[in-house]
């Protein structure tokens, strides 16, 4: 089997990360592997966010909530919480409540309006987020926010 060539590479220096952004990535116990599975990106004030969203009728709750918040705020988004392990897709009202609870908790910890926080989830479809693990680890995640923490966020 041949290897595919790629031009992708990791950012290697703080100077190459987006100006004013902070990053964090930790292992929160969302995955059984003990690997990093929770990340947070904090954007500077007055940042503008845009999104490209699937047109599929099968969408995770976080996709719908992200799209609504970006439209409602004209793109004024400050934080993005990212989890891996559970996609939180096809989970009904439970998935919606988990997304809203997680973004509310992040907004409290960062002193932001809840509408300024987005959430992205990837992982096993049909499985709700391990919400207790996620919520319990948010204070540690926020403490890890640093401009030079891009790699930890990327690993999650």
Go through each PLM region and give its residues.
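Glycine-rich, mobile lid/loop segments that gate access to catalytic sites or pores
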Residues: 100, 105-156
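Short coil/turn connectors at secondary-structure junctions
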Residues: 34-37, 59-60, 74-79, 112-116, ...
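N-terminal amphipathic/basic leader segments beginning at the initiator methionine
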Residues: 1-54, 58
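Alpha-helical support elements that line or immediately flank enzyme active sites
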Residues: 81-110
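Short, ordered loop/turn segments at secondary-structure junctions
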Residues: 45, 68, 85-87, 122-124
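Short beta-strand segments
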Residues: 41-42, 81-83, 119-121
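Short acidic, glycine/serine/threonine-rich loops at helix termini
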Residues: 53, 92-95, 128-133
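Glycine-rich oxoanion-binding loops at beta->alpha junctions
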Residues: 53-74
